[in-house]
Design a protein with these regions (language model features):
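Conserved ATP-binding subdomain of kinase catalytic cores across diverse folds
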Residues: 1-131, 157, 161
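AlphaC helix of the protein kinase catalytic domain
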Residues: 129-140
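Conserved kinase catalytic-core segment
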Residues: 142-165
Length: 165
């Protein structure tokens, strides 16, 4: 596998040692399994605005804050500088939310840092060390489903208390 340029920068800086494999690619980012020392982690490489494919971008980014009035004006006018600032604000908001949720006790992957537009975090695995399945791929009996629902609702309450949902 050819190492993506964004991850090569992290290898060059000593943040990660090796890219093991791609894990998932979605509308906003591609996630790779990486090795950092003895630890296996994942690296979320955010796609540039031109590469993202989701339709409701305006609603998705609604309410994002930027640093100053110059940035806000540039974003409002959709200048090249403004689009770059909007992109930076979006990526920073995603990373900040992960740290905020973690600090509030929400079960999220442990973040290990944000470097050059790449979020490095813990890889969530099952008991055998394989990447954890997506929720839609898990089969639960009714009792397990009720138990997981109760856990999920407690997590949602914590997110509400943070003001993120």
């Amino acid at each position: 596998m050819k190492t993506p340029a964004a991850l090569q920068a992290l290898i060059d800086d000593g943040v990660i040692d090796e890219v093991l494999r791609p894990l998932k690619s979605g509308k906003e980012a591609a996630v790779y399994v990486v090795r950092s020392g003895d630890d296996i982690r994942c690296a979320k490489v955010y796609k540039d605005m031109a590469q993202r494919s989701f339709q409701q971008r305006v609603q998705y980014q609604e309410g994002r804050k930027v640093r100053g009035s110059r940035e806000a004006r540039a974003i409002g006018k959709a200048t090249k500088y403004g689009r770059k600032q909007q992109e930076t604000a979006w990526k920073n908001a995603e990373v900040d939310a992960l740290y905020l949720l973690r600090d509030a006790g929400v079960r999220v992957p442990e973040p290990h840092g944000y470097y050059h537009g790449v979020l490095v975090m813990a890889l969530v695995t099952d008991a055998d060390g394989f990447s954890a399945p997506r929720l839609g791929e898990v089969e639960l009996d009714p009792d397990q489903a009720r138990d997981f629902h109760a856990v999920l609702m407690r997590q949602v309450v914590r997110m509400l208390c943070c003001g993120l949902i």
